Amino acid sequence: MDYCAYCEDIFVLGDVHADFRSLANLINRKHPRIVLQCGDFGYWPGFKVKNRRGVLKDSRPRIGETKLYWCEGNHEDYSCFRAHETSEVFPNVFHMGRGSTLALPDGRTVLFMGGALSVDKAWRTPGYDWFPEESITTGDLDRLPDVHVDIVISHTCPAEFEIMDEDVLARDSCQQALSHVLAKYHPSLWYFGHFHRFKKGCTMGCRWTALTMAGCSNWWEHLAAK
């Protein structure tokens, strides 16, 4: 199998924040077979969401035959799904529960581990636009499968990844939980969003990539080959 050609068919995306127009434009231009998305997808099915210019966003992602798999971030409507369960929330759009896995056609296994703490919690209303379920729990860690994992898709990142220096976003309990994931699986690749900045590194043999958000540069890239 030509792994380089195959990976051209799989995209990894940073935060979407319900900007489904940018998502559809990208997919219609590039026609990926599979999309892996790193949380803050913008799953607010009961909300009418506006973009930064005050224009009403598309309420449903329209992605044709592409299959999209996303983990939850800290900005989703947790009243409309369970963080540890996998479900098809729109046609060809799958929420991947914490600890769920996806087998790629090249034989690699992807683990999804969403969740992160909201630094804007003080400006949000519990049960309306903020939910305590955003945090990764010990129960989530207990449910992790005993399988080989090649790639992790998460929203935030393990504490070991040097993504930001002395910033309020750079440390939360979810990062400590993801450190457990890193130690348990020793994946070769890890992708995440949350910080709205682009950065790459390698820690404990794991090549990691932080992606930005829809509408910005470096908000997506092709999945790295083996």
Where are these regions (language model features)?
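A short helix->loop->beta-strand "cap" motif at the edges of active sites that frequently abuts
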Residues: 64-68, 185-188, 206
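Active-site environment of divalent metal-dependent phosphoester hydrolases
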Residues: 17-24, 42-47, 71-82, 102-103, ...
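Catalytic cores of nucleotide-sugar-dependent glycosyltransferases that transfer UDP/GDP/TDP-activated
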Residues: 13-16, 126-136, 161, 166, ...
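Structural motif
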Residues: 9-10, 34, 108-109, 150-151, ...
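Active-site-proximal loop/helix segment associated with metal-binding centers of metalloenzymes
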Residues: 108-168
